[in-house]
């Protein structure tokens, strides 16, 4: 069996994200066996075909150290030019494959038209991440004229022959919000965290709470910062709150609120950190915060591997998998309960006990994830 895997979206938007971590390890862990794979990319004059090994190299580029002024798209294009992948014409692609896999979210017309074409001829499979543009629209600002393609992507997610979801929550949201026929194949495969080497826990002199991710409303950065400020100003909390991640592209008021908290002290906001820098910052923290709505939450698994216990609340599928093994639900009843949570988990004894629960060997593996995707392709 031969499957084509469309990663055109990555070539046009190759910035390190949770989805691109999934793509990276889907390629790196694609098993040798009876399901052979080509990763399909756009090249001058048609499309290029990469082996899983080649695709793994390409998809690793966003996670490598680079100078701040280097445009990652230039690095990707240079890699493709040097790799000189096997080229085919668009019209010849259909004859090559027994199945077609779209492993990432894409609203590109070329990607969606290609998927539509394959859906008429061979089984089609998608990796489903979430339906958040449908359920959390405030977090998204689509380019003018793109709404029809956004709808087209979710139509395919509802109708593909098989969907591999990254969590039970994702599966349920696709079935209910997108009204996917439950008789169609739909499965769950948990992305891994074992790309991070295990580190021993450390405790800084003053407690540090770290939160990783872009400033999206669904991740509640403003609520976290306000609650922390209340704990500091009203209850004398001696701790630090560290935000790591990019600014909100959909709501400037979120960025302004976080900058205001930074100006008042005890709160830091680091943007543009490299992978290695992020890992060191998380490793050096007392606890990792994951609050709000996540389709999955790979950083939770990374934190546990890095020696840092996780405190979470809201929809947090990856954290739920690790309850009692490095993750603890806060049950803070929203923002009003967070100041008390900050005070409680600043206690060194509480943090030590929480750290002792960590079981970094228990995080899901990328090999297991890739195996489940291959099985879905085989059975589609």
What is each residue range found by the language model?
Residues 1-380:
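Carbohydrate transferase catalytic cores enriched for Leloir-type hexosyltransferases
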């Amino acid at each position: 069996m031969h499957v084509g895997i469309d990663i055109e979206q990555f070539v046009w938007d190759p910035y390190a994200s949770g989805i691109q971590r999934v793509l990276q390890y889907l390629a790196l862990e694609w098993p040798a066996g009876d399901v052979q794979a080509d990763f399909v990319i756009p090249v001058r004059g048609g499309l290029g075909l990469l082996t899983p090994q080649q695709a793994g190299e390409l998809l690793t580029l966003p996670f490598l150290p680079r100078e701040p002024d280097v445009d990652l798209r230039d690095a990707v294009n240079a890699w493709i030019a040097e790799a000189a992948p096997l080229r085919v014409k668009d019209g010849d692609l259909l004859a090559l494959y027994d199945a077609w896999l779209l492993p990432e979210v894409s609203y590109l017309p070329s990607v969606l038209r290609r998927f539509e074409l394959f859906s008429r001829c061979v089984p089609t499979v998608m990796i489903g991440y979430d339906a958040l543009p449908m359920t959390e629209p405030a977090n998204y600002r689509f380019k003018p004229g793109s709404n029809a393609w956004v709808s087209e992507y979710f139509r395919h997610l509802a109708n593909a022959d098989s969907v591999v979801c990254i969590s039970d929550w994702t599966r349920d949201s696709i079935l209910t919000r997108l009204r996917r026929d439950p008789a169609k194949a739909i499965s769950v495969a948990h992305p891994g965290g074992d790309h991070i080497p295990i580190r021993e826990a450390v405790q800084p002199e003053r407690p540090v709470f770290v939160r990783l991710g872009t400033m999206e409303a669904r991740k509640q950065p403003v609520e976290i910062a306000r609650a922390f400020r209340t704990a500091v100003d009203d209850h004398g909390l001696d701790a630090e709150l560290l935000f790591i991640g990019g600014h909100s592209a959909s709501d400037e008021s979120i960025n302004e609120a976080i900058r205001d908290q930074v100006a008042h002290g005890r709160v830091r906001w680091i943007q543009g950190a490299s992978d290695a820098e992020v890992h060191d910052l998380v490793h050096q923290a007392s606890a990792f915060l994951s609050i709000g709505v996540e389709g999955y939450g790979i950083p939770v698994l990374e934190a546990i591997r890095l020696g840092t216990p996780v405190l979470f609340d809201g929809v947090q599928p990856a954290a739920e998998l690790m309850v009692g093994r490095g993750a603890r639900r806060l049950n803070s009843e929203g923002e009003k309960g967070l100041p008390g949570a900050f005070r409680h988990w600043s206690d060194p004894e509480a943090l030590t006990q929480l750290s002792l629960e960590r079981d970094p060997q228990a995080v899901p593996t990328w090999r297991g994830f890739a195996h489940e995707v291959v099985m879905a392709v085989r059975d589609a």
